[in-house]
From Swiss-Prot:
Name of protein: Hemoglobin subunit alpha
Modified residues (N6-succinyllysine): 8, 12, 17, 41
Keyword tags: Acetylation, Heme, Iron, Metal-binding, Oxygen transport, Phosphoprotein, Transport
Gene from which the chain derives: HBA
Residues engaged in binding O2: 59
Modified residues annotated as Phosphoserine in this record: 4, 36, 50, 103, 125, 139
Family per similarity comment: Belongs to the globin family.
Binding site for heme b: 88
Amino acid sequence: MVLSPADKSNVKATWDKIGSHAGEYGGEALERTFASFPTTKTYFPHFDLSPGSAQVKAHGKKVADALTTAAGHLDDLPGALSALSDLHAHKLRVDPVNFKFLSHCLLVTLASHHPAEFTPAVHASLDKFFSAVSTVLTSKYR
């Protein structure tokens, strides 16, 4: 999926506003994913998955850091996320549908924390961004 110049601007502006809260929001989105889509828990048998878990927060920060990297490389997502794509496809073997689940929970989390800034245009741009990231992460599954 190609991000338009307006999409790129919306993604960058949103990520700038998120700033230091990215890790917190990543953890919250991951908690939402586990609560809303319990099958996603199967990839984390070694984690304490209770609400507020330090392990979930730490992994949520990793997710947020990867998205921050992606937001900084919107013109080369495959290059920026190549190692992460290899990891998810070849080692972790995460079912691609889980990226859609997490993307949805990220949108909900961001909208709940920034309702005024979460306009329909921003929502659409972030949805396209998360979809593009998901496409890159699943590109090496073939």
